Regions:
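A conserved acidic beta->alpha catalytic loop
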Residues: 83-91, 106-108, 141
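Short aromatic/hydrophobic "clamp" motif used to bind/position activated sugar donors
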Residues: 133
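Acidic donor-binding/catalytic loop of UDP-sugar-dependent glycosyltransferases
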Residues: 89, 136-153
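Cell-envelope/extracellular polymer assembly enzymes that use nucleotide-activated donors
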Residues: 45-48, 78
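Short, acidic, metal-binding catalytic loop of nucleotide-sugar glycosyltransferases
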Residues: 65-76
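Long helical/loop segments within the catalytic core of UDP-sugar-dependent glycosyltransferases
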Residues: 105, 110-125, 149-204
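N-terminal membrane-anchoring/stem segments of glycan-assembly enzymes
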Residues: 1-43
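Acidic helix N-cap motif at the loop->helix transition within catalytic regions
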Residues: 59-61, 88-95, 103, 145
Length: 204
C-alpha cells in the first residue's frame, strides 16, 4: 500500500520542490531593479489609446483627462473610447473630456473582448495608421511618462510591451492592500525578473 502511495507522493513532492526553487531563484532577478539600459526620448512613434468602457461614467472622464496630460506631443497620439452597450453618460462624458468616442450596441456580443475586436476592425481601416495600440481599462490612471517609455521601447524593436500595473489606493482598506501586494509580486517576480534575464513576460 505504501509503495503505491510513494509512487504518487514522491513525484508530487519533487514537482513542488522544483517550482519552489524556480520561483525562489527567479524572484532574485526582480528585487534589485531594472537592468541598465539606454533610453530613446526622440518622439518617433504614434499611438492609438483605446479604452473599452461599459457604464463607466464615474471614472471615464478622469482617465481621458489624464491621457491628455501625458508628456508626449498631442499630435502623435489619439484617444479612443468605445462606449460598449452603455446605459449611462459614459459616451457624453468621454467626448466632453476630449476623446474620440465610438458607441457600440450589441445584445448578443457583450464584454471587453467583443468591444476590442469591434474597435480594432475600425481602427485598422482608418486613413491614419498608428505605430502602436495601447489598451486601458476605464478606471486606470497613467504615469505622465508612459508614452515616452513606450516610444523608447518601440524604437528599440520591441513589439509587445506590458506596462507596470499598480493600485491607486493601497492604504484605503486591507483588501486594496492585498491587491497592491499581488501587483507588486507579479510585477517583480514575473515581469521584471523575467525581463532582466531575457525571458518573455506574461500580459496582465
Amino acid at each position: 500500500m505504501s509503495t503505491y502511495f510513494d509512487l504518487i507522493m514522491i513525484p508530487l513532492q519533487l514537482l513542488i520542490v522544483f517550482f519552489t526553487i524556480y520561483y525562489f531563484t527567479l524572484s532574485f532577478f526582480g528585487l534589485f531593479g531594472r537592468r541598465p539600459e539606454e533610453k530613446i526620448y526622440d518622439e518617433q512613434k504614434t499611438f492609438a489609446m483605446i479604452v473599452c468602457a461599459h457604464n463607466e461614467e464615474q471614472v471615464i472622464g478622469q482617465l481621458v483627462e489624464n491621457l491628455h496630460l501625458l508628456n508626449y506631443s498631442d499630435h502623435l497620439y489619439d484617444i479612443f473610447v468605445v462606449a460598449d452597450n452603455c446605459k449611462d453618460n459614459t459616451a457624453q462624458i468621454a467626448r466632453q473630456a476630449g476623446a474620440i468616442v465610438y458607441e457600440r450596441f450589441n445584445d448578443n456580443e457583450k464584454g471587453k473582448g467583443f468591444a476590442m475586436d469591434w474597435m480594432f476592425q475600425r481602427l485598422f481601416e482608418m486613413e491614419r495608421q498608428y505605430d502602436a495600440v495601447c489598451v486601458f481599462d476605464a478606471d486606470n490612471l497613467v504615469h505622465p511618462d508612459f508614452l515616452r517609455e513606450m516610444n523608447s521601447r518601440l524604437c528599440k524593436g520591441e513589439r509587445l510591451i506590458q506596462g507596470y500595473l499598480d493600485s491607486k489606493n493601497p492604504n484605503d482598506t486591507w483588501i486594496s492592500g492585498v491587491f497592491s501586494i499581488s501587483f507588486w509580486v507579479v510585477n517583480h517576480v514575473w515581469h521584471l525578473a523575467k525581463y532582466n534575464i531575457g525571458l518573455s513576460s506574461c500580459l496582465g
